[in-house]
Amino acid sequence: MPNLHPPIITTQQAKSYYSQILEVVPKEHSFKPLMTLFLTEQSDILDIAEGVKRGIVSAVKLYPAGSTTNSSNGVKDILHIYRLLEKLSHLDIPLLIHGEATDSEIDIFDREAVFIEKTLAPLRKSIPELRIVLEHITTQE
């Protein structure tokens, strides 16, 4: 998802990309892509909610800025989006997380564990009702 340039950040972009995907699916196949939006500090909760309501958007995806390929548009400070995350929780919209701390002083093999401790644990405590999927996690912590 962050490998798309530019990232899919609005419902309209997701709808367009959905159509592009279906254009290349052979007619004899039954395939329904589940579209997600790339979460930024400027994401519009009304657009997200409308996308979910219309069946276009299934979830939003959080990439910490600088955590992976093409994630520079990601969230720099999760505290800046807490209000949006609270609204996602109230609307029961899942948050998919690429859980990785981005501080260059943290060993690459410790970045998931540090993210869990410093970011995910406080988030879960602050917004316990928020549905979270921590994607491709490899740490035991």
Residue ranges: model-predicted function:
Residues L46-L62, T68-E141:
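Histidine/acidic residue-rich metal-binding segments in metalloenzymes
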Residues M1-D47, G55-S72:
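Metal-cofactor-binding active-site regions of metalloenzymes
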